[in-house]
Amino acid sequence: MKKRFLALLLSVCIGVSMLVLPASAAGSNTAVQTAVTLGAFSTEEAAGLSTPLTRGQLAKLLVAFSAYHDNANTQGSIGTLYTDVNGSSAYAPYIRIAVQQGWMSGYTDGSFRPDQTVTLEEACTAALTLLGYDVTTLTGGFPAAQLNKANAIGLRANLSRTQGQAMTMEDGAILLYNALTANTASGSV
């Protein structure tokens, strides 16, 4: 009888502890777990979610959450992509795909700057292009047009960043997770 009571008490404690989890934490956790499952984050990277999101990491996130996620492993090491990204870089296949698909681009000086921190508007612009939106045809100027469109289709749900603020790894996972259920430019999900 005592064992049954303890088992019941234990199951009630576990059940109650699950109810205390805030909704935002659950959503964030789901986004991060999805990023890990898709290969966008290693388990070590998932442990450092508050670290700034870089352009190289954003390229990896974009590819992982796209139909091209299997192509990254077949890219191989093909020469120098940019002056600061050689073909053997861990981010090289992801950067190559992200640039080829038009989701991201390099700079006029021939660099990509894979270690540069990404701002909210840069990440939203990349996510919108991933979804097929032509960001040059949005109403308004950069970055307001991109941020407004991202907000309208739900990309910014559960993100507290504002214009000009740096994104974290967790923010990047949430943004791309939101892209999974956002309408594409053609109107489909």
Across the structure, where does each feature detected by a protein language model lie?
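Feature responds to low-complexity, polar/acidic, surface-exposed segments characteristic
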Residues: K2-A31, V36-A92, Q100-E121, A127-A166, ...
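Surface-exposed binding/hinge segments that line
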Residues: E170, L175
